[in-house]
Amino acid sequence: MKVILREDFINLGKEGDIVDVKDGFARNYLLPKGFAVFSNKHNIDIFSQKKRAILKRQETRRKMAVELKEKLDKVNLEFIMQSNDSGKLFHSINSSNIADELLKLGFEIERRKIDMHHGALKAFGTYNVTIKLYEGISSVITVEIKREEKKNSLKKSKSVEKEV
């Protein structure tokens, strides 16, 4: 089925592009969520009239993505996580956690634009995570997972008091 995209869609096309997708994907996802419209003569005429505005909007998005990339390249996220005695994390870090931390820093990034090369981060260490901002423009941020310090010294002092 041919549809016209109403907004940029990763791995599919840009706003105003006519793309051929499977019928189920169009009927069950793209059309109900408003990401696309049917490709018929009427809609093609409407989008051809809007083409200049679409191109201007795409150029604005590209400029904003370049500015955002410059800011994001300086970002280092740090997660302090709990683990068991063998060093395994109780909770892994996924794209939602990273998007939430970026939001706290003032960056509104959609979760689907965060590319986790390694899948969810399940061990302590430093990782590079790619954020796809716009076609051909992406930023790499550093995510560091550190161990939360346990309060063993507090437990030891309590046990000494009980013995006395």
Swiss-Prot record:
One of its GO terms (cellular component) is ribosome. Keywords: Ribonucleoprotein, Ribosomal protein, RNA-binding, rRNA-binding. It comes from the Bacteria. SUPFAM superfamilies: L9 N-domain-like, Ribosomal protein L9 C-domain. GO terms for biological process: translation. Gene3D superfamilies: Ribosomal protein L9, C-terminal domain, Ribosomal protein L9, N-terminal domain. GO terms for molecular function: rRNA binding; structural constituent of ribosome. InterPro entries: Ribosomal_bL9 (IPR000244), Ribosomal_bL9/RNase_H1_N (IPR009027), Ribosomal_bL9_bac/chp (IPR020594), Ribosomal_bL9_C (IPR020069), Ribosomal_bL9_C_sf (IPR036791), Ribosomal_bL9_N (IPR020070), Ribosomal_bL9_N_sf (IPR036935). The keyword Ribonucleoprotein applies. Belongs to the bacterial ribosomal protein bL9 family. Binds to the 23S rRNA. This is Large ribosomal subunit protein bL9. It comes from Borrelia duttonii (strain Ly). The gene is rplI.
